[in-house]
Amino acid sequence: NYDRIVAVGNEDFLESAVPVSYWLEERYPEIEKVCPVITDQGKSKQIFYGDKKLTADLVYADSTFFGLFSFKILDGDRDRLLEDPYSAVVSESFARKIFGNDDPIGKSLRISDSTSVMVTGVMEDINRSVIPNADLLVRIERVTEFNQSLSKTNPGNAGSCVSFLLLKPGMDLKGRTDEIQSFFKERYWIYRYDFVKEARVVPLSDIYFGNTASHSLNQGDKRFSLVLMSVGILILIFAIINYINLTVAQAGQRAKEMATRRLLGSS
């Protein structure tokens, strides 16, 4: 699905209100499914299991998360992992920390004394992704227990959710950005009051080194990476030149030694 996933943001940032992806899903038949994801509200939550208490980073997502993203599932039914609003998927490393060698499936965890979730799956730790590594992945509905402005029907908080869309094969929304802007102008307060002006549809492949900033996803500095690459290439070139010079010098030295031996009558 990598080449069919996009995120919808604006000229300043990639985040949006939670309802945005659902609005677009209703409006555009090009969209196969949507998945709002929140990462910045789940940092350093207290997780309780029996007499254990650990600090964990949570990601809140729609039940469609594993239908969009291909993170490896180590235990559990991929198609039903987040089916229940109180389900949770734990990372392999966190499962080992909190459950040891016990089977995590069906175990109940408390989050910051406010709610309980049941483990339905174990996933491989997230690496090399725009989505930060999470100890727990829980349903997006659970975030409202800490922040009411992030409900599925409340567009008030425009700065914590990334609206991921999975487009149908062969479909493209980039040509519809003007239409999306007009729609947002009617329905979305940050456009209506001109806090932002431009809607952007950003392919997943362009997020890491893209021009649209995000405080909740992993991003890289393309310019810095190019500088490092250039430095690496220069070091390699100098190393090759030094090797060639050293080889030539050693060959010359051996030629002199052989000439000297011949003059002295050595064979």
Please provide the spans of the model-predicted regions.
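Mid-to-C-terminal secondary-structure elements
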Residues: V59-D75, A88-G220
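N-terminal membrane-entry
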Residues: S216-I235
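Acyl-group handling in specialized metabolite and lipid biosynthesis
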Residues: G9-D12, Q219
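Intracellular coupling helices
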Residues: A239-S267
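Generic structural signal for small/hydrophobic residues in well-ordered secondary structure
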Residues: V8, L24, V34, F66, ...
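Short amphipathic beta-strand/extended segments in non-transmembrane regions
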Residues: V6-A7, A17-D75
